[in-house]
Amino acid sequence: MQKSTSKYVIDPISIKTNCSSEESYIRCVEYGKGKAHYRNLILLAKAILAGVFVGVCAHASGIAGGLFYYHKLREYVGISMSAFVYGFTFPIAFLCIICTGSDLFTGNTLAVTTALLQKKLGLLCYMRVMCISLVGNYIGAVAFAFFVSYGSGAFSINTDTSKNHIFQFLNDIAIKKVSHSFIECICLAIGCNIFVCLAVYFVLSIKDGSGLVFSVFFAVYAFAIAGYEHIIANIYTLNLALMISNDISFTQVYFKNLLPTLIGNYIAGGLVLAFPLFFIYRSCYYDYDKMNDELNTVVLKTLSLELQNESNHI
């Protein structure tokens, strides 16, 4: 059997700490294609787990940011210190998702869309994966918000102003999120998911562990501190705000924020990133796919000859 010399071979064991741009795209398509092989219940479980991780770290970020939202400190530094701490804590969610192989809808908008564009999965299969990941993320985030964040009373309102800063921080974030216009929210969501999808791309491109952690951390930190809109994080934050506050309504949460955020996140991954990458590197993937087909044909022929020789000996 001849060894392939194609430059598009995905080599998991290499002295290189990062992939070439062509190999990164190939890995992205293969990653998206691989999601279609899971059964519905497995996909749902992976998506619920990702939603829980977002909830866990959004809870921790809310507490950390709230501690710096103390009213006397806020008089001097405003929200800047709380935003810094919030953004510094939240990226842990994405590291948890990556390490456990959980399924996040926003990352799928890039990976699964590239697999669709390369015709490695059909439209119905694409919609199945995307819908299950979104529903699972929603279940995980809302369940954590209700059973842990709301159930523990960590964000409950306190009549004592000196002890109400954690509730006030979450409440102010929620009010700000539902104050955007529909178009503003879409634009902020596009900015957010560009960073999130790039974080996924970094994971597929960088082989060095510490480099991977730093690249993912700063990509997610950038969107968190910039005030961008992330659909799964917002599902947790705004549903928790609905549970503990009367300052926002169901209509504001779902139609003024979550709907435009969903649209903007999808535009970022599925259009802004997936289409240009497909246009630039599609021929690289075709070469890789063709090479794999030829290799599989050689393997099958070799196995056929070996079986034929064995039968002749018998």
From Swiss-Prot:
Pfam families: Form_Nir_trans. GO terms for cellular component: plasma membrane; vacuolar membrane. Its main location: membrane. The chain crosses the membrane at residues 48-68, 78-98, 129-149, 186-206, 212-232, 261-281. One of its GO terms (molecular function) is high-affinity secondary active nitrite transmembrane transporter activity. The keyword Kinase does not apply. One of its GO terms (biological process) is nitrite transport. It catalyses: (S)-lactate(in) + H(+)(in) = (S)-lactate(out) + H(+)(out); formate(in) + H(+)(in) = formate(out) + H(+)(out); pyruvate(out) + H(+)(out) = pyruvate(in) + H(+)(in); acetate(out) + H(+)(out) = acetate(in) + H(+)(in). Disulfide bonds: none annotated. Residues 1-47, 99-128, 207-211, 282-314 are cytoplasmic. Keywords: Cell membrane, Membrane, Transmembrane, Transmembrane helix, Transport, Vacuole. This is Formate-nitrite transporter. The gene is FNT.
